[in-house]
């Protein structure tokens, strides 16, 4: 429960921001009812037929019991990961017993993917599930779910692979509409949720011929048809406008935007009036109001959506997005909405956790890491983070260690390191959750820093550590070493941090002297920051990335400065694959633009052959595309030289570019800026499933 003291403190913050609390009562409709309806539909369409057709199998009884348990665990308010191991054990026993029904395998894959971060086992079983589905005569709903499952298991995967699986799911959804009895009027909310929440807007807009019929089915009630038609008009509005900044939108784009949003307002308003107990139309109207095509405010429509279903999270996210300054909103409103989510005290829902998501959005509107840290150090925010973790720990007993990690992060963010230290003792053997790790990485931090700073604080060394950090920022290494040398009785939890700091001092001292320094990726990867991807360090210092999709990025923590010369080798285990894209990244991390100022020297495999280009990481802003014939089945040497914002790059002994200007007036159009805290590392944009890239240690020296 949320204490009255915390609730009143939050209400004072909301009053100061002019943001009324979100109305909530114990009887407010929540997603619990929706999940119950969804489980009932899945049981009718998939699970009951599975039980009937496998009744004579030796594994039938266990499969039936497992299916019921898995459905309850997966399709509920929150999956309790502490129970995943037991369900995963039952899943593996079914596989050993020979269970081969596609419905059973579909549930097995979902459970295995929840058990641990490594989803390779789940992927392998997913392929078998899809094969079994194609051999059988199961509802096309299962084909949709298996395809969506496939897309989900491509964790950071190639857009081509993910989108291909999602489009296949849409085709199966269309086929399922033709099945008698699969979709009835009662399932209208399930259908709308599937269409609006699972298939991204960009995918829908770029495949209009496929999705247009899906938004205009004739079997659902009028309110549902009006909701879908209005939602489709919103998609068409953005398709006409484009995703560029307002000054770059064409006159015709603005005309289409207005015409379609006017139609959307008509259909969505009618849908809401026909059935105000459903949240979908009101949520869609938040975006329409944001663009100025509603007489009522976005907050009015948000209140209507949450009155229909308090924890309809798309409404909360839409309201936060509409509150951004770029849409005429205010940062104060974004902050207030995040706090208002906690103020509801509804720990039986996901609403209080929106505090984290809301602050994530606000952080993107701030400039610089200190401004971001200051946000979390605000007394109201610090107290709210602690209260959120305590509330969920009390409401979900099976997730105590999970929320302990969030408490540890909240304490570290807000500067309450004593809370972090206490929470870390309660995490047990649970590894750091991916969501916690990614938020640390956003701040160029990791678990070593989190644990180390908490341990140093407990030992009374915080002031000394901060002095050392300040000296490091100024590159005053003698002063930093002087502080570290005086630290006595360093706790074991802090030793990895102190040892790493000494290594970085040594590397940067040598770099400052113009010496060559080797940046090796040992198995601990303790000197590297993994911003994306499942990187592995090897005993020989090589870095390995195995195909899990795209956007893998890992940078070394040593600062290389704005001018450097570097060399190494790169190799592919599957050089014949036509969809590879990998290389070397350099630049710096930027909180106000999460991907940061990373520029990549990439080797590209395509159907046209091998080529090389310079790119802004995460964005298709390539400025060079030159053919290369190097044989990447063996280590191929590369060199990079960056000086005065000009890049010279060789690959396999040949020049890819020479003195290519990257500055503000160059081809990257200001997307690269040299800084004293620049870093270097490895990247991939596309790494097909099952293939790997091997990078040798980077040898680098700083230039004057």
Which residues does each predicted region cover?
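Short coil/linker segments at helix-helix boundaries
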Residues: 23-25, 29-32, 40, 44, ...
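Extracellular carbohydrate-recognition regions
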Residues: 502-532
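Short carbohydrate-recognition loop motifs
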Residues: 533-552
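Short, aromatic/His-centered strand-loop micro-motif at the edge of beta-sheets
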Residues: 615-639
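Carbohydrate-binding surfaces in secreted/extracellular proteins
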Residues: 522, 568, 632-666, 698
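Extracellular beta-strand elements of beta-rich domains used
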Residues: 696-703
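Flexible glycan-contacting loops in extracellular carbohydrate-active proteins
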Residues: 659-694
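Secretory/extracellular carbohydrate-interaction modules
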Residues: 546-613
């Amino acid at each position: 429960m949320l204490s009255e003291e915390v609730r009143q403190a939050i209400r004072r913050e909301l009053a100061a921001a002019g943001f009324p609390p979100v109305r909530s009562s114990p009887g407010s409709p929540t997603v619990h009812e929706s999940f119950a309806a969804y489980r009932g539909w899945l049981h009718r369409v998939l699970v009951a037929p599975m039980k009937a057709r496998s009744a004579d199998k030796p594994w039938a009884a266990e499969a039936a019991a497992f299916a019921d348990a898995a459905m309850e665990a997966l399709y509920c308010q929150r999956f309790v990961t502490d129970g995943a191991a037991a369900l995963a054990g039952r899943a593996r026993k079914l596989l050993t017993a020979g269970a081969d029904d596609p419905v059973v395998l579909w549930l097995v894959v979902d459970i295995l993917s929840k058990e641990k971060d490594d989803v390779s086992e789940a992927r392998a079983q997913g392929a078998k599930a899809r094969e079994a589905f194609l051999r059988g005569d199961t509802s096309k709903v299962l084909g949709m779910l298996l395809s969506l499952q496939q897309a989900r298991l491509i964790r950071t995967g190639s857009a081509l692979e993910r989108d291909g699986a999602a489009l296949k799911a849409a085709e199966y959804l269309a086929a399922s509409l033709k099945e008698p009895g699969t979709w009835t009027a009662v399932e209208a909310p399930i259908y709308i949720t599937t269409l609006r929440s699972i298939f991204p807007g960009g995918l829908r807009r770029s495949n209009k011929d496929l999705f247009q019929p899906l938004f205009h089915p004739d079997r659902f009630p009028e309110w549902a048809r009006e909701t879908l038609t209005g939602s489709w008009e919103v998609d068409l509005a953005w398709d006409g406008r484009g995703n560029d900044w307002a000054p770059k939108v064409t006159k015709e784009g603005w005309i289409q935007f207005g015409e379609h949003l006017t139609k959307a307002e008509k259909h969505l308003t009618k849908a809401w009036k026909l059935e105000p107990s459903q949240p979908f139309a009101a949520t869609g109207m938040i975006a329409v109001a944001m663009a100025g095509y509603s007489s009522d405010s976005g907050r009015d429509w948000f209140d209507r959506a949450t009155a229909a279903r308090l924890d309809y999270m798309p409404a909360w996210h839409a309201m936060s997005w509409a509150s951004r300054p770029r849409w005429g909103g205010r940062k104060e409103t974004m902050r207030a909405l995040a706090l208002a989510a906690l103020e509801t005290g509804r720990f039986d829902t996901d609403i209080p956790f929106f505090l984290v998501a809301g602050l994530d959005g606000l952080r993107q509107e701030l400039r610089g890491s200190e401004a971001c840290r200051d946000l979390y150090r605000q007394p109201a925010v610090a107290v709210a983070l602690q209260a959120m973790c305590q509330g969920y720990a009390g409401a979900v007993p099976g997730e105590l260690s999970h929320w302990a990690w969030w408490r540890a992060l909240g304490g570290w963010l807000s500067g309450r390191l004593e809370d972090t230290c206490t929470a870390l003792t309660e995490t047990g053997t649970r590894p750091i959750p991916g969501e916690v790790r990614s938020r640390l990485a956003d701040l160029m931090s990791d678990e070593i820093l989190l644990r180390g700073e908490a341990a140093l604080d407990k030992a009374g060394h915080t002031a000394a550590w901060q002095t050392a950090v300040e000296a490091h920022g100024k590159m005053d290494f003698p002063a930093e070493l002087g502080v570290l040398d005086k630290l006595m009785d360093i706790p074991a939890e802090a030793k990895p941090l102190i040892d790493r700091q000494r290594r970085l001092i040594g590397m940067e001292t040598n770099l400052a002297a113009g010496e060559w320094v080797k940046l090796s990726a040992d198995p601990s990867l303790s000197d590297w920051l993994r911003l994306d991807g499942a990187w592995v360090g090897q005993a020989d210092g090589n870095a390995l990335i195995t195909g899990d999709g795209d956007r893998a990025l890992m940078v070394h923590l040593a600062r290389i400065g704005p001018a450097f010369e570097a060399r190494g080798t790169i190799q592919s285990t599957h050089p014949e694959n036509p969809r590879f894209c990998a290389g070397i990244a350099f630049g710096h991390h930027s909180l106000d633009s999460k991907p940061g100022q990373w520029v990549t020297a990439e080797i590209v495999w395509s159907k046209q052959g091998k080529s090389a280009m310079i790119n802004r990481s995460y964005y298709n802003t390539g400025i060079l595309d030159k053919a290369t014939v190097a044989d990447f089945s063996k280590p191929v040497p590369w060199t990079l030289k960056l000086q005065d914002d000009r890049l010279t790059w060789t690959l396999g002994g040949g020049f890819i570019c020479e003195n290519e200007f990257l500055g503000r007036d160059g081809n990257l159009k200001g997307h690269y800026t040299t800084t004293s805290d620049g870093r270097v590392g490895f990247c991939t944009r596309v790494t097909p499933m099952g293939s790997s890239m091997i990078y040798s240690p980077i040898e680098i020296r700083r230039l004057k």
